[in-house]
Amino acid sequence: MLQPKRTKFRKVQKGRNTGLAHRGSTVSFGSIAIKATERGRMTARQIEAARRTISRRIKRGGKIFIRVFPDKPITEKPLEVRMGNGKGNVEYWVCEIKPGKILYEIEGVNDELATQAFKLAAAKLPFKTTIVTRTVM
C-alpha cells in the first residue's frame, strides 16, 4: 500500500477540495491516460486495486505510470467513543483528486487494449473518469 515514509505532521486538518487541477493535467509519460472528471478522494487501496486491474489486463506488455500518491492521513475514532478527547488515530491515506487530474498513463500498448484496461480500472474508482490521448505539438 502507498503511504509517505515520513511526514512533517502526523495528522492534518480536513480542508476543502476546491478548484481544478492545473498541475498533473496533461499526458506526460505515456501515450494514453485516464483523467478524473469529478472531484473526490482516492485511497491507497483504490490506487492499488486500479493498478492491479490495469496490469492484469495489459499483461506483460507496456508500462504503467501512476500519477497520484496518497499523502493525506485520514483519522477515525474507535466505535462507541464519546465526542471530544482529541483527534482520532490515522486509519488510512488518501489523495485529493480535482477535476482534470491525470491518474494513470500507459505506454507501449495499443490504444484499444489500453482503453479496455482503463474502463475496468474506472469501475474501481469513486468518481467519473475519461480516457485521453497524448496531443503532440
Swiss-Prot record:
<comment type="similarity">
    <text>Belongs to the universal ribosomal protein uL16 family.</text>
</comment>
<dbReference type="Pfam" id="PF00252">
    <property type="entry name" value="Ribosomal_L16"/>
</dbReference>
<keyword id="KW-0694">RNA-binding</keyword>
<dbReference type="InterPro" id="IPR047873">
    <property type="entry name" value="Ribosomal_uL16"/>
</dbReference>
<dbReference type="GO" id="GO:0022625">
    <property type="term" value="C:cytosolic large ribosomal subunit"/>
</dbReference>
<dbReference type="InterPro" id="IPR020798">
    <property type="entry name" value="Ribosomal_uL16_CS"/>
</dbReference>
<comment type="subunit">
    <text>Part of the 50S ribosomal subunit.</text>
</comment>
<keyword id="KW-0699">rRNA-binding</keyword>
<dbReference type="GO" id="GO:0000049">
    <property type="term" value="F:tRNA binding"/>
</dbReference>
<dbReference type="GO" id="GO:0019843">
    <property type="term" value="F:rRNA binding"/>
</dbReference>
<dbReference type="GO" id="GO:0003735">
    <property type="term" value="F:structural constituent of ribosome"/>
</dbReference>
<dbReference type="GO" id="GO:0006412">
    <property type="term" value="P:translation"/>
</dbReference>
<keyword id="KW-0689">Ribosomal protein</keyword>
<dbReference type="InterPro" id="IPR016180">
    <property type="entry name" value="Ribosomal_uL16_dom"/>
</dbReference>
<protein>
    <recommendedName>
        <fullName>Large ribosomal subunit protein uL16</fullName>
    </recommendedName>
</protein>
<dbReference type="InterPro" id="IPR036920">
    <property type="entry name" value="Ribosomal_uL16_sf"/>
</dbReference>
<comment type="function">
    <text>Binds 23S rRNA and is also seen to make contacts with the A and possibly P site tRNAs.</text>
</comment>
<keyword id="KW-0687">Ribonucleoprotein</keyword>
<keyword id="KW-0820">tRNA-binding</keyword>
<dbReference type="InterPro" id="IPR000114">
    <property type="entry name" value="Ribosomal_uL16_bact-type"/>
</dbReference>
